[in-house]
A protein has these predicted regions:
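A short, conserved structural fragment
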Residues: 346-356
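Auxiliary N-terminal substrate/complex-recognition segments of SAM-dependent methyltransferases
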Residues: 6, 340-342, 370
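Short amphipathic alpha-helical interaction segments
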Residues: 332-346
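Minor-groove-contacting beta-hairpin "wing" of winged helix-turn-helix DNA-binding domains
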Residues: 357-361
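C-terminal scaffold of the Radical SAM
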Residues: 2-6, 25-49, 53-332
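Local cysteine-cluster metal-coordination motifs and their immediate loop/turn environment
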Residues: 10-24
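Short, amphipathic alpha-helical interaction segments positioned at domain boundaries
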Residues: 363-378
Length: 378
């Protein structure tokens, strides 16, 4: 294994579940100490498998990792560094909610080795935040970013497009205000209403409270133009970064670099096997206590699957993929309709070719799900 690997650690605890959340989380942290101990034991189980591999990214995701007390977080990171070989200059990312960020916590994260913080801002409009159960307000979000930027940390902010009550104007304002802070990375996600029964029911009952698909498309394109004018490059469907500030760990997923995952529901790609841990906390903890990984999925990836993944994941990146790889895969797949679809996407300006590489145009990114799903289903 030549490429440096990445390590993901899932910390599932939250004060409350947000209206749009589809991740594995728990609002009861009474078992947190036991869970952190299970993480350390799972790391031990993986130590021999990771022997000889080097890591250059550690991603503490959730859930709400910023809820973990600093002394426990420091111990966890020290345990991981003792089990896995991390390169100098490794990217250590922690996800945080704005309401958790204090000067004291920030300094503790830095002592733990955190160098990058991803903040769940989601919006800078109080009414929009309240509509989906966020616990912070706009002022609190800006205050948290200011505290983090003051320590020289690399900062990422998440925004959501399509929130209840959001207008094109309020979304534009959130993007512009985020650009004026010290962040060097911005992620914009479309609200997936179908993942929340309450939000989907509200959208059906009050469609006037939600931007239409066309309005979301226009707002997304405008946001990209705003970010570009402020020095951010659009490097992946949902992500913009200042030069050199791309999310190193997440890029591993899109380039099929080796990753290991610790914790409930964690996914990984290792030695061309896709694996995923069980999504139930009791099952996870009990399995690790018994000395075995709680795998709900463990299967090899065939050469054909790997080729398909390289295209599907690679097209998510603005650099795209070698045109020859796409053409070769289409020729080998034997789907009689796919070649015609492929030509249509190019003729319609969704895909562009330059320097022997095929990539989505900005408009193409908007319709990327349709295109990528076609590759998946062929």
């Amino acid at each position: 294994m030549t490429a440096a690997a990445g390590l993901y650690v899932h910390l599932p605890y939250c004060r409350s579940r947000c209206g749009y959340c589809a991740f594995v989380v728990s609002t009861d942290d009474s078992g947190r100490s036991e869970y952190l101990g299970a993480l350390a034991r799972e790391a031990t189980l993986l130590e021999s498998e990771a022997c000889g591999s080097r890591f250059d990214s550690l991603y503490l995701g959730g859930g709400t990792p910023s809820l973990v007390p600093p002394d426990e977080l420091v111990r966890l990171v020290e345990e991981l560094r003792g089990r896995f070989v991390f390169e100098d200059g490794s990217e250590v990312t922690l996800e945080a909610n704005p309401e958790d960020v204090t000067i004291e916590l920030r300094d503790a994260w830095i002592r733990a080795g955190v160098r990058r913080v991803s903040v769940g801002v989601q919006s800078l409009e109080d009414a929009e935040l309240s509509a989906v159960g966020r616990r912070h307000d706009a002022a609190g979000a800006l205050r948290s970013l200011d505290r983090l930027a003051g320590a020289g940390l690399s900062l990422s902010a998440d925004l959501i497009l399509g929130l209840p009550g959001q207008s094109a104007g309020t979304f534009r304002g959130s993007v512009e205000r985020i650009c004026a802070t010290g962040v060097d990375h911005v992620s914009i996600y479309l609200l997936e209403t179908e993942k929340s029964r309450a939000i989907e029911d509200d959208r059906r009952a009050h469609p006037d409270r939600y931007l239409s698909d066309d309005e979301q498309a226009d707002a997304w394109l405008e946001a990209g133009e705003t970010l570009a004018s402020r020095g951010f490059a659009h490097y992946e469907i949902s992500n913009w970064a200042r030069p050199g500030r791309e999310a190193r760990h997440n890029v591993k997923y899109w380039t099929r670099a080796p990753t290991l995952g610790l914790g409930v529901s964690a996914h990984e790609l290792w030695n061309e096997r896709r694996r995923a841990n069980a999504s139930g906390l009791p099952v996870y903890v009990a399995s690790v206590r018994e000395g075995r990984r709680p795998l709900a999925l463990d299967r090899p990836v065939s050469e054909g699957e790997a080729a398909r993944e390289r295209i599907i994941l690679g097209l998510r990146l603005s650099q795209g993929v070698p045109t020859a790889d796409v053409q070769s895969w289409i020729d080998e797949e034997g789907d009689p309709l796919l070649p015609g679809d492929y030509e249509d996407w190019r003729d319609e300006g969704l895909l562009a070719e330059k320097g022997g590489r095929l990539r989505f145009t900005e408009r193409g990114f908007l319709l990327s799900n349709e295109v990528l799903c076609r590759f998946v289903s062929s």
